[in-house]
C-alpha cells in the first residue's frame, strides 16, 4: 500500500461518507466538489449502490461512542469494520479515519506510525480492524477530535461552563486535541503523499482538564476546573493514559497547535 495516486481529484467524483458528523461537515467545506452523504442517505453497513464509481472516498462514517462500544461491540464492528469493507468494495482509493485509541498508552513519548497498535477498548479494536480492511489508500489516525457541530468535548464544556461554577475533569489522560477544520485541510494535502498509515493530529498536547480550562479561558467563562482521575470518573471503556500522535514520515502534513484550533472553533461557535 506504499504508493500514491497521480491525482485522485483529477477525474471522477469524490464521495464523503458520514457527512453529517463533525469530521464529515469539515470535509464538506474543504472538498466542495464532493458527493457528501449522511447516514440518512447512505448506510455503509449495507452493500452500497451509487450508480457511479468514485475516484476517491473520504470515509468519515463510523461508530464513535467509545463507552457504548463496550456493551455493544457487535454494532461497533458492523459500522467500523463491515461498513469499511463495503466502502472499500467500491474499488476507489480510500481515506479511512482511525484513532489514537488503537494504542494502549504505555509510552510517554508520541506514538508514530511504526509503533505497534494494542487497543484497550472495544472501540479501539474495531477501529484497528477497520484499518485492516484498507487495500488502497490512506489510513489517517488522529486524536481527540472537536468541531463546531455534533457531540464533542469542547461543545460540552461550553455548555457546562455557562451552567456551573465548577466542573470535574480527568487530568491523567494526555492527547492532542485536533480541530476537524485543520484535519480536513491536512487530509486534502495528504492526497499528494504515498498511501499507507499517517498520523495527523494537532501540534502540542494536553490533558482533558487542560483543555477544559483553555475552553473557559478563551470563552471568558468563570468556571473552575477540578482535576480528577480516570478511575474517579468511572467510565465503562478503558482509555490510554497517553495517546499523543506524531508523524515520523517524510512530508507529513503539519497541523496547527491545538490551542489555535480551539480558538478557530470557538470563533465559529460565536463563543
Where do the protein language model's features map onto the residues?
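Catalytic helix-loop patch of NAD(P)-dependent Rossmann-fold dehydrogenases
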Residues: 71, 78-83, 102-140, 144-147
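SDR active-site strand-loop-helix element
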Residues: 17, 37, 60-61, 94-100, ...
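Conserved C-terminal active-site "lid" loop/helix of NAD(P)H-dependent oxidoreductases
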Residues: 48, 207-213, 228-271
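NAD(P)H-binding glycine-rich loop region in Rossmannoid oxidoreductase-like domains
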Residues: 48-79
Amino acid at each position: 500500500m506504499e504508493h500514491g495516486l497521480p491525482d485522485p481529484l483529477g477525474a471522477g467524483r469524490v464521495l464523503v461518507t458520514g457527512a453529517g458528523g463533525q469530521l464529515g461537515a469539515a470535509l464538506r467545506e474543504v472538498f466542495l466538489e464532493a458527493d457528501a452523504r449522511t447516514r440518512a442517505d447512505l448506510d455503509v453497513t449495507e452493500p452500497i449502490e451509487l450508480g457511479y464509481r468514485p475516484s476517491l472516498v473520504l470515509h468519515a462514517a463510523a461508530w464513535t461512542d467509545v463507552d457504548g462500544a463496550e456493551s455493544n461491540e457487535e454494532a461497533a464492528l458492523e459500522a467500523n469494520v463491515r461498513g469499511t469493507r463495503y466502502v472499500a468494495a467500491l474499488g476507489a482509493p480510500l481515506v479511512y479515519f482511525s484513532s489514537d485509541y488503537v494504542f494502549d498508552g504505555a509510552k510517554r513519548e508520541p506514538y508514530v506510525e511504526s509503533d505497534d497498535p494494542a487497543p484497550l477498548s472495544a472501540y479501539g479494536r474495531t477501529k484497528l480492524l477497520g484499518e485492516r480492511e484498507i487495500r488502497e489508500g490512506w489510513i489517517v489516525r488522529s486524536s481527540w477530535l472537536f468541531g463546531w457541530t455534533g457531540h464533542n468535548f469542547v461543545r460540552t464544556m461550553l455548555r457546562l461552563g455557562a451552567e456551573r461554577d465548577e466542573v470535574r475533569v480527568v487530568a491523567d489522560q494526555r492527547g492532542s486535541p485536533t480541530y476537524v477544520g485543520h484535519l480536513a485541510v491536512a487530509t486534502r494535502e495528504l492526497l499528494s503523499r504515498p498511501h499507507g498509515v499517517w498520523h495527523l493530529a494537532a501540534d502540542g498536547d494536553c490533558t482533558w482538564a487542560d483543555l477544559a480550562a483553555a475552553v473557559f479561558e478563551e470563552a471568558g467563562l468563570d468556571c473552575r476546573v477540578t482535576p480528577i482521575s480516570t478511575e474517579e470518573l468511572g467510565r465503562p471503556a478503558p482509555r490510554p493514559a497517553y495517546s499523543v500522535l506524531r508523524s515520523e514520515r517524510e512530508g507529513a502534513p503539519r497541523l496547527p497547535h491545538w490551542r489555535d484550533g480551539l480558538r478557530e472553533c470557538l470563533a465559529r461557535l460565536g463563543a
